[in-house]
Swiss-Prot record:
Annotated binding of ATP, by residue: 11-18
Swiss-Prot/TrEMBL site (Interaction with substrate tRNA) positions: 102, 125
Gene (UniProt): miaA
GO biological process, one term: tRNA modification
Enzyme Commission (EC) number: 2.5.1.75
Name recorded for this polypeptide: tRNA dimethylallyltransferase
Cited HAMAP family: IPP_trans
Renumbered residue ranges of the record's region Interaction with substrate tRNA: 36-39
Co-factor requirement: Mg(2+)
InterPro entries registered for this protein in UniProt: Dimethylallyltransferase, IPT, P-loop_NTPase
Magnesium as UniProt keyword: yes
Catalytic activity line of the entry: adenosine(37) in tRNA + dimethylallyl diphosphate = N(6)-dimethylallyladenosine(37) in tRNA + diphosphate
GO terms for MF: ATP binding; tRNA dimethylallyltransferase activity
Length: 314
């Protein structure tokens, strides 16, 4: 049975994935699936750098604005929804193009990841949640480092839910989450062209800093204030970079200037972690866009890899 063709564009935040994906979708008769775990949330537009209607330019986008901020969302649900979109887009004679920066989510779609339906150990989970509240997220993250350093490296301390899930897997099965994933990383389920964008680090960091300034000008403070005033607390959504820092400001833990500075720092660190993840976990063909766009070059590469003809070459 012939595998479905999928183009995937990955790279750190602010590197220019959105524009490239739309240009490629136009040329390759494609439709776009967001591979970002935070763009799924409604009303969280500015802080997630969500693609706008104007930017979409008529290209259908999926996995955007599908959940309310107070709702949780799992990798397993992402996997199920995206695979359904891939199937439906392919059936319409279009090319699915996955775009994003959340490595584990994208990887879970492309490879044969199995997610167990067992409830785990609710008592142990509650104990860990209590520890996180009483002794801090870093304490729980350190416990994960002791039993599963690879997962601890991959999962940020502030993502308490996933930290506790990894601990719970080890507690119930005696097996590391990282080992479980490693077993499932061998075979691609699709005929994939995996493209990565990179650029000079200083230039990327300058772009990230500028993006944060633009977000503030566009109304990020008001966007986060709206969530805060709705009473949204301790939710998966507000762990996102761009929200947790501004929440600290509304909780009077830092000044606005300090919050913005921390947002820039966290965004730069996240970009570095994204690049490390993709380079270590995926067989990516990288294109350096320091000196400008490489749209034509990338288009030719995808055409060759997936044996496609673009609208430009017809």
């Amino acid at each position: 049975m012939q595998r479905e063709k999928v183009a995937v564009i990955i790279g750190p935040t602010a590197v220019g994935k959105t524009k490239l994906s739309i240009d490629l979708a136009k040329a390759l008769n494609g439709e776009i699936i967001s591979g970002d775990s935070m763009q799924i949330y409604r009303t969280m537009d500015i802080g997630t750098a969500k693609v706008t209607k104007e930017e979409m330019d008529g290209i259908p986008h999926y996995m955007v604005d599908i959940k309310n901020p107070e709702e949780s969302f799992s990798v397993a649900e992402f996997q199920e929804r995206v695979r359904k979109h891939i199937r439906e887009i392919t059936e319409r004679g279009k090319l699915p193009i996955i775009v994003g920066g959340t490595g584990l989510y994208i990887q879970s779609v492309l490879f044969d990841y199995q997610f167990t339906d067992d409830a785990g150990d609710a008592i142990y989970r509650e104990q860990m949640e209590k520890l996180a509240l009483e002794r801090g997220v870093e304490y729980v993250h350190k416990k994960l480092q002791e039993v599963d350093p690879e997962s601890a490296e991959r999962i940020h301390a502030n993502n308490v839910r996933r930290v506790i899930r990894a601990l719970e897997i080890f507690h119930t099965s005696g097996e590391k989450m990282s080992d479980q994933l490693e077993k499932q990383e061998n075979e691609l389920l699709y005929d994939v062209s995996l493209i990565g964008l990179t650029m000079d680090r200083e230039m990327l960091y300058d772009r990230i800093n500028l993006r944060v300034d633009i977000m503030m000008d566009q109304g990020l403070l008001e966007e986060v204030e709206g969530l805060y005033n709705r009473g949204i607390r301790d939710c998966q959504s507000i762990q996102a970079i761009g929200y947790k820092e501004i929440y600290d400001y509304f909780e009077d833990r830092v000044s606005l200037e300090e919050a913005v500075s921390q947002l820039k720092t966290n965004s730069r660190r996240y970009a570095k972690r994204q690049l490390t993840w993709f380079r270590n976990k995926m067989d990516v063909t990288w294109f350096d866009v320091t000196d400008g766009e490489k749209t034509s070059e990338i288009l030719r590469y995808i055409e060759g890899k997936l044996q496609l003809k673009s609208n430009n070459s017809k």
